[in-house]
């Protein structure tokens, strides 16, 4: 995406009236994984709906282009993340979750713009690092994260289902440019 096109994307805090559009964009963005992880998809879809419907302590951001929401992300503070009724994972840094770009807006820098805003906000709060989780199915996202300077953080990995590894990544903000 050229600088001119990137500047046409406006990142802002989500509003209550954005909720339906956020859910539509998020589900559309993640729908491609339904066929690739059928045994896991139903639970993951429920998690997406619950997270978007009640972001809790997370900052919910949206990317707008031409007056339409074309991307969204959740930015959580450090916390203890519940993985199941018995398991949890300490997240020592702020965490990006559910980065989603409408399929029609992909390749235009929307995801990168949302990520840069998350980095900016964590830096403003004097955070030392930013974390996220992803899977090997999300190769495009993984390449973007690595270009931005994220590195593997295996201590944040977890296994929500047999054969499914959710990989942790971290961006050290003291080293990142």
Q: Which residues does each PLM region occupy?
A:
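Short coil/turn segments at beta-strand junctions that form active-site/ligand-binding loops
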Residues: 59, 126-128
């Amino acid at each position: 995406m050229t600088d001119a096109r990137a500047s046409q994307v406006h990142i802002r805090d989500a509003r209550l009236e954005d909720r339906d559009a956020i859910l539509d964009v998020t589900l559309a963005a993640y729908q491609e994984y339904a066929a690739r992880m059928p045994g896991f998809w139903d639970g993951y879809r429920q998690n997406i709906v619950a997270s978007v419907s009640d972001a809790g302590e997370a900052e919910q951001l949206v990317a707008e282009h031409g007056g339409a929401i074309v991307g969204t992300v959740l930015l959580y503070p450090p916390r203890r993340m519940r993985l199941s009724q018995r398991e949890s994972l300490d997240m020592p840094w702020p965490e990006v979750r559910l980065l989603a770009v409408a399929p029609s807006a992909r390749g235009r820098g929307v995801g990168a713009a949302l990520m840069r805003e998350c980095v900016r906000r964590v830096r403003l709060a004097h955070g030392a690092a930013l974390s996220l989780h992803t899977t090997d199915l999300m190769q495009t996202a993984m390449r973007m994260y690595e270009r931005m300077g994220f590195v593997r953080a295996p201590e944040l990995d977890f296994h929500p289902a047999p054969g499914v590894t959710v990989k942790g990544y971290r961006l050290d903000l003291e080293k990142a440019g």
